[in-house]
Amino acid sequence: MSNTKWTLRLIVDWLIIATTITLSSYYPVLVIPGLFIIGSRLQALSIIGHMACHNFCSTNKTINKYLQYLAFYPLGVSPTRYKKFHFAHHRWLGDPQKDPEVLLQLEVKDRWSKHRKSDLLLDLCGIHYDEILQIFKYIGTKYSVLFTVCMQALLV
């Protein structure tokens, strides 16, 4: 994909998030659907950040770096720490002692094995706040303003 397509996708995702937040503030009936929309766009941004981390979004490393920051910012994720975490995952892929993603899964295994139907909606909305914080422990986040505001709004 060309530099422009990745940048355009990032801009569109940011605009969808901003529009959804704005419309939800004026029309409360849109809050629940808005959670799904914002969740899907945050997931899309994380994919853009991941691809930029591998320098796949552009042949220019500086553009990839900026795309990482713009993609990871609403997630509260530091691109530098994400790269460290993610590249360790690639280096130790599947190793139960060294792969950070495997270690994370083992840490929350009890919670997943006792998964209830009522948690499905929370998973779809991304509202498992304590698990999100656990993941952030591994990737060393800097809480962004957008992330903090969204999480506080969800917890109220």
Feature locations, PLM:
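Conserved donor-binding loop and adjoining core beta-sheet/short helix segment
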Residues: Y27-L45, G49, N64, Q68
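Non-catalytic, topology-defining segments of multipass membrane proteins
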Residues: M1-I38, Y73-V156
